[in-house]
Amino acid sequence: MLHKKTLLFAALSAALWGGATQAADAAVVASLKPVGFIASAIADGVTETEVLLPDGASEHDYSLRPSDVKRLQNADLVVWVGPEMEAFMQKPVSKLPGAKQVTIAQLEDVKPLLMKSIHGDDDDHDHAEKSDEDHHHGDFNMHLWLSPEIARATAVAIHGKLVELMPQSRAKLDANLKDFEAQLASTETQVGNELAPLKGKGYFVFHDAYGYFEKQFGLTPLGHFTVNPEIQPGAQRLHEIRTQLVEQKATCVFAEPQFRPAVVESVARGTSVRMGTLDPLGTNIKLGKTSYSEFLSQLANQYASCLKGD
């Protein structure tokens, strides 16, 4: 009797353990939520997509927890921008085989699309701060998920990796990629139409994140408060922005939900400029088939609501 109970317990344990292992392994892990938006569209109905960075946290200063490292180790596929953006992931991802990772910044179709970072506006930082800035961002703007063109290339790369890992799901993965590309084309048209009347309206953003989106849709930023949001803008930079606000050269200044807007509020105080919020991470959007398109539309609405004065 005891022997039968032992065998039954062992069988149940194996089944439960096997199921848990399968659930833990059957996942795409994306570094940041917008990267997860792209991945979840391609993996929809095939495997789970999870996001490493918690809502409300910033990719600029996050530290991995032991549970995060386990998630990376157990993932079927890890998708991230690269060490210039998610420095906190560099060590564990470097131990993963190439077949189990997509590094967006290193994709051959993405490299020609990379934009240079803008450092010139922050010359009043001291030398130590400047060095930290350059180390963190490198030569290029790494907010790559804000480019629909790069998002399209990322989706193709994720599709290719998942087909290699899960060839039995090729038909579904093919359909998902086709749907994503069609949605993206439609959203680009819709966003372009919404933002077209706003070309020529000047504004300041909190940090140098939005260049890809702004270039694609013809927006005209006057500048940013800081290149790296971990570093407070210097007094000279704040004075320059304040002067342009007083002279009514800008319609809006934009803060971000991941950082306290005190410095933005103080510079705008007493002027007629409007304040808005841009969320470069799509914090309130859930992963799903249409989440990347929702993200682009939300960002466009955030620009438009302030620039139009709605």
Swiss-Prot record:
InterPro entries: Bact_metal-bind_prot9 (IPR050492), Lipoprotein_PsaA-like (IPR006128), ZnuA (IPR035520), ZnuA-like (IPR006127). Induction: Maximally induced 30 minutes under zinc-limiting conditions, still induced in stationary phase. This is High-affinity zinc uptake system protein ZnuA. Zn(2+) binds at residues 59-60, 143, 207. The keyword Disulfide bond applies. It comes from the Bacteria. The gene is znuA. GO terms for cellular component: ATP-binding cassette (ABC) transporter complex, substrate-binding subunit-containing; membrane; periplasmic space. Belongs to the bacterial solute-binding protein 9 family. Keywords: Disulfide bond, Ion transport, Metal-binding, Periplasm, Signal, Transport, Zinc, Zinc transport. CDD domains: ZnuA. It comes from Escherichia coli (strain K12). Part of the ATP-binding cassette (ABC) transport system ZnuABC involved in zinc import. Binds zinc with high affinity and specificity and delivers it to the membrane permease for translocation into the cytoplasm.
